[in-house]
Amino acid sequence: MGGGDLNLKKSFHPALRRNQQAVWDEEQKALAERKRTQQRLDEIKEERAKEEVQRQLEAAGGKKKVDRVEWMYQGPNDGQTGTTEETEAYLLGKRRIDNLIKGTEHKKLEKDAGTESFMALQNANTARDTAAKIREDPLLAIKRQEQAAYEAMMNDPARRRQLLASRGIDEDKKDKSRRKEDRHRRRHRHRSADGEDRHHRRRRSYSRSQSPRRRDGSREDRHRRRRDDSRDRHSRRRRDGSDEEGRRDRDNRSGGDRHRHDGDRRHSDEPRDERRDNRRDERPRDNNRQYSRRSYPSDRRPRHNEEDDKAKEEERQRKLAAMQSAATELDVDRQERLADLEKREQAAREADNKARERGGDRGFVNKLHQQAEHKGLAERMGGARRGYQKDDD
């Protein structure tokens, strides 16, 4: 049994061929590197010798040489005429640089890349194209579908109530706060209207008291006063919105008109001194009338309570109607689901009956096969033995 030298089986043994090949390759690389280094040293020596000769010539009175990096301006990348791709193509030997040096290809590129082509591309984005792009935008279509679904859900009172409940918002409290704000706004509006009307009446009474007292019994003054009283009565009746208050106001106004007409007649018949006395007697009556007018808006407060009760009742009726509609919708959905389930069960029963009718002819044979599959070995041997006995008989 000769196994040879066991050292040759080691991977690091120097007698192996692959190890010798690796050593030889490394030696060749070192020699090539030494040759390149020596060549570069020789080139440096030659350049130094040339520089020394040039320096000696310049010192002897020769022409001076200007040191410039001309190698940066040489090659295919001549200013704006070249690109990185062209430089790589030139280095790989796939492209000639004659045309780049001459400049003909650069001019051709300038013609092709003019402003006309750029503007032609810009003209494609017209208003119609932009509208079509916006209309066919899938994200915009998705947003529209989401908005439509949200609006449908908010229009449904039951689902809207569920959504608000999930967010922790009480719709009843929200409605109460809204009604309170509306009530406060109405009260503020009525108070401002009453203040303006009171100020207007005060200014009119003051202007009447400051005006001269001549021609009180004339027909034009009576007509003017009657027209002013009717305008005030109409505005107050429209603001109050009550037939009872309007009727009371008309009675008061008619009584005042009768007193005024009687006083006018008395003024026209009586002497001037008696007329002055009657005017003094009538002043407290006018003051009482103005006081009654000022105290009139205080009777309107119960009417606001009635309006609030009416608004609450309407809101309650609206909520009740919404609850009833939601319950009706739930009942309709439940009935539809039950009807659909019943239809499915009926279709399944019909399919089962058809399958039974189709397999009724082969039912007996299938039953025999099933019985044969479930028989044991003893039963089969016993049946075969009985068959043999019958044959012997």
UniProtKB/Swiss-Prot annotation:
Q: What's the name of its gene?
A: CWC25
Source organism of this protein record: Gibberella zeae (strain ATCC MYA-4620 / CBS 123657 / FGSC 9075 / NRRL 31084 / PH-1) (Wheat head blight fungus)
Q: What does the annotation say about its assembly with partners?
A: Associated with the spliceosome.
Q: What does this protein do?
A: Involved in pre-mRNA splicing.
Biased composition, Basic residues: where in the chain? Answer: 181-191
Kindly list the places in or outside the cell where this protein is found, as annotated in its UniProt entry: Nucleus
Which Gene Ontology terms of cellular component type are present? U2-type spliceosomal complex
Pfam families registered for this protein in UniProt? Cir_N, CWC25
Spell out the protein name for this chain. Pre-mRNA-splicing factor CWC25
